[in-house]
Structure formats: structure tokens, C-alpha cells
A protein has these predicted regions:
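Conserved Radical SAM active-site core
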Residues: 217, 221-251
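Iron-sulfur cluster-binding cysteine motifs and their immediate structural context
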Residues: 161-187, 202-231
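Short Fe-S-cluster ligation motifs
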Residues: 186, 190-208, 239-262
């Protein structure tokens, strides 16, 4: 397992979190035909996975933005580190190819990280790690370098707190998520919302996202703080309607384009802030 350890150490150093190697068989078996075909086309001769977590926990002070969206967009931060890791791995293992993924991926990244031994899968679908709880982003590198490793993912203790405290009742007993009732999904949704969905956002105090299921999770008692600079610097915990007033889509992108809350544009955020204001005025 020497090459597995060396490869994982390189990735862990780049992601400033944790990493582990695994064989791809069990992960590929869980994928649909289209995603499996895409993965094998992108990495011909796929024989190994290097899975990693990017911790993002900073602080739990007030605000109307979800914790994951307060620093730089994790896609940008993760991509930079994965590219750096791929370059280092290509030098360490010449002749092999390495391709990084973070969120935009044919692979089930949470399952892959759990299969690699980095944590358990919570009933809210998030990876539960020992050091950082669920305050992590999952990433991975697929390679034709033969790698061993992987074990049946640990099971969530199923205390039921996430299910019972979910504002919209989006989590079912068997761990399925109803997107139409998930506050985080609704704050990102474009187009019309039902009256109940609008009320859910208005009562939440959140302009983007929802951290309720994470805040109550026992795995998140005392998580370590991230060491990733992009998640520590230029933190923005809230947005106001005044800050968005009069901005065109282009101006909004120029001002907030490096933030995770910007990918859906300014319209959903304006709507959410208006719903928060309406709820406050009705009290």
C-alpha cells in the first residue's frame, strides 16, 4: 500500500484536509450507465480513485448566508488545489494520468469519500468526518494508476435530529431528500414558488442556503477550523437588499462572481431578501 499512501499524502497536502486511496469498483457499480460511460471516457483505463475533503468550517456567528457560501466559491478553491495535486502526482508517478473533480462530476463523490474511509454518510446525505464533522466539500482524482483500498461505508447512528429539525420536513426516514421541501434548494430555485415555499424562506432568516441539519448533528460538536485561506479570508456572512439594489446581472457577477451564492444570479437572492423583509414586517 506504499503508493496509495504516497498518493494520498500528496493530495491531502494540497487540499489541506484529508485524503485516501481506493479502488473504483464499488463506486462504478453504484453509478448509472451514462455516468459510468462518461467516467471511463474521461479517464481511459480507470484503476484508482484518490478521494479528499476540503474543510470549510470557520465560525458560527449570525448571518443570512449558509456557512459554505461565506468564503470563496468552493469550486474555485477546490479546482486550484486539485490541479496542483494532479501536477504533483504526475511528477511522482510519471506515465499515469490524473483528473480532478469537485461537485461537477460523473462520480458520486460523497459515496466515494465514504468508500475510501474518510467518513460516514449522514441521513442528510452529507459526509460526516471525525475532525470537521459535515463541514467539508468532497473532491476526488480519478487515475489509471492501479490503487487498492475501500471498505463498506460507515453508517450514520441515525439519531434523527436532522430529520426532526429540518424546517421543511424534507428528510424521510429512509434518508431520501425532497428537494421541493428543502430550504437550501428553495433559496437557490429560480421561477415561481408555492405560497408554503415562500413562507418557509420568509420564516427561515436565510437569504441563501440552510445549515439547520448540520448545526444539530452530533458529528458537528466541536469541529476543527479550516486552514484553507479562501474559507478564512474575505468572509461575508450576510447580504442586504440595499447591496443588490440596481445591479444588473453583469454587475452582480463582477462583484460577487467568486462566491458560491452567485451562480444562480441576482434574482433568487432579491426574492429571498424580499420574503425575509415581508416576514419581518408581518411580526
Amino acid at each position: 500500500m506504499e503508493k496509495e499512501r504516497r498518493a494520498a499524502d500528496i493530495l491531502a497536502a494540497c487540499c489541506q484536509g484529508a485524503a485516501a486511496a481506493a479502488s473504483p469498483g464499488a463506486v462504478l457499480a453504484r453509478m448509472g450507465e451514462a455516468n459510468r460511460r462518461q467516467a471511463l471516457e474521461q479517464v481511459p483505463g480507470l484503476q484508482g480513485l484518490l478521494c479528499c475533503v476540503f474543510p470549510y468550517f470557520n465560525r458560527l456567528d449570525g448571518g443570512n448566508l449558509s456557512l459554505y457560501a461565506r468564503g470563496m466559491d468552493y469550486h474555485l478553491a477546490a479546482r486550484k488545489r486539485l490541479d496542483r495535486a494532479c501536477e504533483a502526482l504526475e511528477k511522482e508517478f510519471p506515465g499515469f494520468q490524473f483528473r480532478g473533480y469537485a461537485d461537477v462530476s460523473p462520480f458520486p463523490e460523497v459515496y466515494a469519500c465514504a468508500w475510501a474511509g474518510l467518513g460516514a454518510i449522514g441521513k442528510n446525505g452529507l459526509l460526516l468526518t471525525r475532525r470537521w464533522g459535515s463541514y467539508v466539500f468532497c473532491g476526488m482524482i480519478a487515475t489509471d494508476l492501479p490503487l487498492e483500498g475501500g471498505e463498506e461505508p460507515q453508517k450514520c447512528p441515525d439519531c434523527g435530529l436532522c430529520r426532526r429539525t429540518c424546517p421543511g420536513g424534507a428528510l424521510s426516514q429512509d434518508g431520501r431528500l425532497d428537494q421541493s421541501r428543502c430550504l437550501s434548494a428553495l433559496t437557490q430555485q429560480k421561477g415561481e414558488l408555492t405560497l408554503e415555499q415562500r413562507r418557509l424562506i420568509g420564516r427561515s432568516g436565510m437569504a441563501w442556503g440552510c445549515d439547520v441539519c448540520q448545526r444539530v448533528c452530533p458529528a458537528n460538536r466541536g469541529p476543527e477550523q479550516t486552514k484553507i485561506a479562501e474559507f478564512l479570508e474575505n468572509i461575508r456572512s450576510s447580504l442586504t437588499a440595499e447591496e443588490l439594489e440596481g445591479l444588473t446581472q453583469r454587475e452582480f457577477r463582477q462583484k460577487y462572481g467568486d462566491r458560491a451564492f452567485a451562480w444562480r444570479g441576482v434574482v433568487p437572492l432579491r426574492r429571498n431578501l424580499a420574503l425575509l423583509s415581508q416576514e419581518k414586517d408581518s411580526l
